[in-house]
Amino acid sequence: MSQLFPGRYTVNVSEPFVIFLIGMRVNQFWAMKKWWSVSSAMGPMLKVLKENPEKGMLGAESFFRVWPLETCMVTYWRSFDDLIRFARSSDDPHLKPWQDFMKNIGGDGSVGIWHETYRVNPGDYESIYGNMPAFGLGKAFEPVPISEKTRKATERMGAIAQK
């Protein structure tokens, strides 16, 4: 079990960062070969990113729904440029699975894929965690205890920008 941080904590991030959400949805369960190829492509990508922090991914959390069969991964990146560089590089394990998806699945409707990208500036976010292990932003960045100045969401939002 991961180490719990007792009490309440937040994160203070002084540099811009990127939140990238990515997921897939099985639309035709019987098309297992197609959706399995999509879902199994994520493991090698995460392995490379974990072993090579210079590529810019700072952390990730995964979520899964049984029906309809869906996945969602929330990832935190140092910059949008790092994310795009990884996605487009033929030396990294994203480009080939993307090309395979477009060739073998494309618009046939068997598997849905999606992503959303958000650039976040210091002070344009807030977070709180209570009696949790490092999670989300609290895993991607250093967790700090809640103080009198960061007790409320309205105090945390914009706290970095005001410094």
Regions found by a protein language model. Name each.
Residues 1-65, 70, 82-85, 109-163:
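Short S/T/G/P-rich N-terminal loop/turn motif that feeds into the first structured element of a domain
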Residues 80-113:
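An amphipathic, aromatic/His-enriched active-site/gating alpha helix that lines ligand/cofactor pockets
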